[in-house]
């Protein structure tokens, strides 16, 4: 495979400790000319669905790259370490559903391998820091152009772990949908496609709260609840100048009913 000058890096490691720096150090030692794009390291700890959503929303706008992602509550267990080829990119991380939405956003999984080649890994693999000792070294070697097949044996894509399909239920006067993510601003992204808003009127209800269907935040007065199609094409609920998640009392995995008002 041809070398790539880019690695993207997404984790739940936070910024208070040295975990991100340690992984950057591994990458810099192995492939010092490769540029690293830090997508985020503030995924809520262990929140695989949030990490998957952030990664999937980012990769279509990144250059062709090796996408290194670690949100890994099962680190050190029997869960597989994997790398995937998808579209013009490669993805490296745990086999826990984290990578598959991003792979789909890139065009779908073309090949998958389990990361078992000891020559590609750190000298001493910690049971609790696979980001440093497995995933970062593999990402670096792939960025240098090493063949994906050399990382380990092929994995049948149908056996990869998938996240549960979130609920979306169309109804006569609206729909019920699972909360996918809550972003930094408190905006609530639903699993529902924006197309589900098309038949609904401007005046809506989100559960018992009155809301307005609009194009953007400033279409309503400050403090008003609004429903719109977000930048990824999903239905989102927001408050102009406020936090919809706090107003509605919801977190990812909860369900919201959106109906004609």
From Swiss-Prot:
Pfam families to which the protein is assigned, alphabetical: SAM_HAT_C (PF20257), SAM_HAT_N (PF01887)
Record-annotated site: Important for activity: 72, 79, 130
Residues that hold adenosine according to the record: 12, 72, 187, 239
Binding site for (R)-S-adenosyl-L-methionine: 187, 231, 239
InterPro entries named among the record's database cross-references: SAM_HAT_C, SAM_HAT_N, SAM_OH_AdoTrfase, SAM_OH_AdoTrfase_C_sf, SAM_OH_AdoTrfase_N_sf
Domain of life the protein comes from: Bacteria
Enzyme nomenclature, EC number: 3.13.2.3
SUPFAM superfamilies: Bacterial fluorinating enzyme, C-terminal domain, Bacterial fluorinating enzyme, N-terminal domain
Catalytic activity: (R)-S-adenosyl-L-methionine + H2O = adenosine + L-methionine + H(+)
Keywords: Hydrolase, S-adenosyl-L-methionine
GO molecular function: hydrolase activity
Function: Specifically hydrolyzes (R)-S-adenosyl-L-methionine ((R)-SAM), the inactive form of the ubiquitous cofactor SAM, into adenosine and L-methionine. Is stereoselective as it cannot use the active form of SAM, (S)-S-adenosyl-L-methionine, as substrate. Likely plays a role in preventing accumulation of (R)-S-adenosyl-L-methionine in cells; maintenance of (S)-S-denosyl-L-methionine homochirality is important for cellular health given that the (R)-form is largely inactive as a methyl donor and can function as an inhibitor of methyltransferases.
Protein family per UniProt: Belongs to the SAM hydrolase / SAM-dependent halogenase family.
Protein name according to UniProt: (R)-S-adenosyl-L-methionine hydrolase
Species this protein is from: Salinispora tropica (strain ATCC BAA-916 / DSM 44818 / JCM 13857 / NBRC 105044 / CNB-440)
Taxonomy of the source species: Bacteria, Bacillati, Actinomycetota, Actinomycetes, Micromonosporales
């Amino acid at each position: 495979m041809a070398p790539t000058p880019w690695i993207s890096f997404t984790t739940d490691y936070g910024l208070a400790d040295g975990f991100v720096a340690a992984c950057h150090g591994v990458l810099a030692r192995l492939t010092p000319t490769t540029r690293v794009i830090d997508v985020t390291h503030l995924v809520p700890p262990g929140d695989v669905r949030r990490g998957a959503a952030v990664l999937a929303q980012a990769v279509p706008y990144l250059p062709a790259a090796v996408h290194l992602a670690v949100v890994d509550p099962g680190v050190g267990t029997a869960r597989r370490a994997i790398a995937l080829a998808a579209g013009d990119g490669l993805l490296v991380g745990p086999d826990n559903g984290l990578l598959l939405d991003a792979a789909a956003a890139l065009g779908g999984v073309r090949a998958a391998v389990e990361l078992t080649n000891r020559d590609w890994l750190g000298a001493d693999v910690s049971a609790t820091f696979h980001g440093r000792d497995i995933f970062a070294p593999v990402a670096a070697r792939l960025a240098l152009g090493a063949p994906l097949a050399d990382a380990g044996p092929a994995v049948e894509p149908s056996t990869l772990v998938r996240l549960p399909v979130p609920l979306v239920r169309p109804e006569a006067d609206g729909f019920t949908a699972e909360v996918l993510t809550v972003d930094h601003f408190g905006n609530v992204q639903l699993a529902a496609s924006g197309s589900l808003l098309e038949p609904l009127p401007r005046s809506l209800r989100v559960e018992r709260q009155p809301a307005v269907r609009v194009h953007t935040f400033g279409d309503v007065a400050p403090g008003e609840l609004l429903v719109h199609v977000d930048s990824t094409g999903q239905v989102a609920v927001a408050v102009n100048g406020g936090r919809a998640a706090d107003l509605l009392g919801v977190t990812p995995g909860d369900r919201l009913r959106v109906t004609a008002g």
